[in-house]
Each structure stands twice: as structure tokens, then as C-alpha cells.
Amino acid sequence: MPRKRLTGIVVSDKMDKTVVVAVEKLVQHPIYKKYVKRTKKYHAHDERNECKIGDVVEIEETRPLSKTKRWRVVRIIQRFEPERVLKEEEDIQEEIEAVEGKGGVES
């Protein structure tokens, strides 16, 4: 049977050779039938201490490595780039100012 693989974002890298990965999934509410985001955190083994906070990683199920670690980092899909986030925030702010300048919202 193949091992489970999940994709998530590193939320903590403070431990040696261990990262905490948050994995989001959509679950349908049993009564209201609306899809709701659910987040679960997994402790994963990072042998070379390569992962940093904000990285998107793929983790794979493995044998128990400690009391809480049952996953290992397979690969880093995308590195976190703070410059890209700042650029996106600036673009959004410019769009808001452009809309407000055209009389969209009056203060």
C-alpha cells in the first residue's frame, strides 16, 4: 500500500530536524452542506534543516520517529519569498487608492 502524501505550509521550524506543517482541507458540513476549511498540524522530520517558515512542502507518512513525529519532508515545493508578498500588498493598496480616487467610497 502506498504511503500517504500531503502538501502544507511550514508554520514552525524552531526544533532541530523537525518542522510543524499546517495542512488545509475542505470538509463539507454534515447538516448545512457548506464547505469549511479545516487545518491540521503535523510534526515532520527535516533531516537537513532546510525548511523555513512559510515554505510550501510535501510530507510523507513514515514509521514513528518520536512521540509526535510520523511524517517526513519529501521535498520543498516553493520557498517563501517575503519580497513577493510585499509586492502583492503594494499592488492591492494601489488598486484600493485608485478606486477611492474615482469616487467609489466617500469618507
Swiss-Prot record:
GO terms for cellular component: cytosolic small ribosomal subunit. GO terms for biological process: translation. The keyword rRNA-binding applies. It holds the Pfam family Ribosomal_S17. Keywords: Ribonucleoprotein, Ribosomal protein, RNA-binding, rRNA-binding. It comes from the Bacteria. GO terms for molecular function: rRNA binding; structural constituent of ribosome. Disulfide bonds: none annotated. Part of the 30S ribosomal subunit. PANTHER family: 40S RIBOSOMAL PROTEIN S11 FAMILY MEMBER, SMALL RIBOSOMAL SUBUNIT PROTEIN US17M. One of the primary rRNA binding proteins, it binds specifically to the 5'-end of 16S ribosomal RNA. Belongs to the universal ribosomal protein uS17 family. NCBIfam families: PRK05610.1, uS17_bact. This is Small ribosomal subunit protein uS17. It comes from Thermotoga petrophila (strain ATCC BAA-488 / DSM 13995 / JCM 10881 / RKU-1).
